[in-house]
Each structure stands twice: as structure tokens, then as C-alpha cells.
Amino acid sequence: PRINRIRYLAEEKIYLRNNSPTSIINWFEKYPPLGGLGKIKLAEAYLEQGRTEKVKELIKEGWVTATIRKNDLGYYRAKFKKFIDSDDHIKRADYLAWERKYWDLKRMLKYLPKDQRALYNARQILMSNSYGVDNAISKVPQYLKEDPGLEFDRLRWRNRRGRLDGSLEILYRNSLKTEGQMVRPDKWW
């Protein structure tokens, strides 16, 4: 029972400094990566062997969803800078925001383009109940003000503060969207 959980946790313990690239690749050929971090570790092993065609696909998939410790974020970003770009950072920031991982999101802000940084900074402040909500939202460019994630975080923030009229306004505005237009409809209540 729970063998996948054990495998997922094992992926976090695999490091190149303790294992050869070949042994890491062999492990993941037998047990395909379950999480984003596993994909990153496999990509790292392929990179050590110069097999860059495999690296790009794995790193782009793994980067978005990986649970990366604070100390490892800069290391992986530097190691894979040829393979990940600002779009990948934006996808990661979006994933972290929707998953409510606001401390990880805060660490990602410096890697985002200016407009996206303003958007995700506002979302992070709303999620973490930090001060400066109005100021952060005012810095979000107009074309991003109706971002579904920002709308969702504003709805939750207003609801927590008992601002039901404001909550209902956002909820109504978004209820007019079709399911295809909504982002993460599973998160809205």
C-alpha cells in the first residue's frame, strides 16, 4: 500500500552527487517519475550525459509542478537556463498560485517579466493576507486586471473579510463565462 507515495518521496532523495547519471536514468526507466522534481532529476542525469534532446521535454514538464526547496531553486534555474524561459516561469507561477503555495510563488517573482511579476505579486499578497493589497492591485497592468486567478484570489480575499457584495459581484461576473472560458473551474465555489 502507498507504494507510489514511497516512490514520490524517493525521487526527492536522488542526487547526482550520490549517484551516477546512469544509475539515476536506470532507476527512472524502471520507475517513471511521478512528480515534477523526479522529472527534473532525470533531466539533470540526461544533461550530464549530454543527451539534451531528452532534457528539454522533461525540464519543461517538471519545472511547472515540482516542489523545489528554497535552496535548490536557484541551482536548478541556473543549471537549466538554456531550456527554461519566461513562459515556463509564468506557467510555474500560475501553478503555484492556483495551488495556494504563496511562499514558493514569492520566491518565483524575481524570475518573471515585469507585468507578470505585478500580477503574481498581487495574487501572493491576497493569498497570504499581507498588507498592501490595494497598492499591489493598482500596479497590475490593465490588460491583466481581469486575469481569472486574480479574480479568484480577490473573491476569496473579500469573502474572508465579510465583503459579500464585492464577493458576489466577482462571482456573478465569472458565472457568465462558459466552462470553456473559465480557468480551473474546480477551484471556484
Language-model segments: residues:
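Alpha-helical solenoid repeat scaffolds
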Residues: P1-W189
